[in-house]
Amino acid sequence: MSAVTQHIIDRGDGARVELFQARPSAPKNGAILFVHGNQGGLLLGGKEAVDDGSLVRFSSRLGVTAAAISQPGFGASDGPADFCGPTTQQAIVAALEFLKQQPSVDPARIVLYGNSRAAVASAMVATKVQGLRALILTGGVYDLREAYGSSSRGLQQAIQKEAGVSNESFLDRSALHHSHRIRAETLLLHGKYDDRASVDQAERFSEALAQVGVPVRFYALEGGHRLPREQVTPILREFLTRIFAPDATLH
């Protein structure tokens, strides 16, 4: 069974980023990095993926290194939170660079997986980092200004506090407007009845990626913001098994 270890890495500006990692006993293979969403005030960060067994489960079943980071302001990562903005994105970039240096990881086979607000940040990271093998996004928004206008008062206040509402702030968090910079194969999962992030956001983002030649698959599932595991699991299994499959060897 994969053992979970905790690491504190440098974000690149002296700030700390907490990362948890489970490594398989298998030979060198790929890696998957999980980025958590809003945790309802618990601020567990990446430890959530440790506590619910996700890291060990993904690592052991796929034979890959599975890691989870704590966003700024969560877990043991230095804050403050900036609602999916440049600081959060830099933390994710630092975690990806850490994984690339691990002896168990093939740096050309790294998958980034962001859920909810982490999908916002992870999509933006994919516009800046070249070489990602794949990108998985669930329940995200990809045009934050548009989403802001129809969001709940509580979410609007969080955006105002953490990010601000300038044009630059919205653009820094809106991958739809930077889709031409993404190269990684992308899997988009979204609930048809999501009341926090409209499924239309994912559909439009999928279309934008396809238009610039990115291999993309979009699934609108029967659910709300929290997607039913019985629908998500088979899609992830098929996608990740293919992504991490050993390269064919010609004799």
Model-based region annotation:
Residues 104-116:
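Alpha/beta-hydrolase fold nucleophile elbow
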Residues 119-130:
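Short glycine-enriched nucleophile-adjacent loop
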Residues 1-27:
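N-terminal cap/lid segment of alpha/beta-hydrolase-fold proteins
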Residues 203-251:
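C-terminal catalytic histidine-bearing segment of alpha/beta-hydrolase fold enzymes
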Residues 82-103:
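Alpha/beta-hydrolase active-site loop
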Residues 140-178:
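Mobile cap/lid helix-loop segments that gate and shape the active-site cleft of serine hydrolases
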Residues 28-29, 38-76:
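Short substrate-entry loop that stabilizes the transition state in hydrolases
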Residues 182, 188-190, 194:
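Short beta-strand/loop motif that positions the catalytic acidic residue
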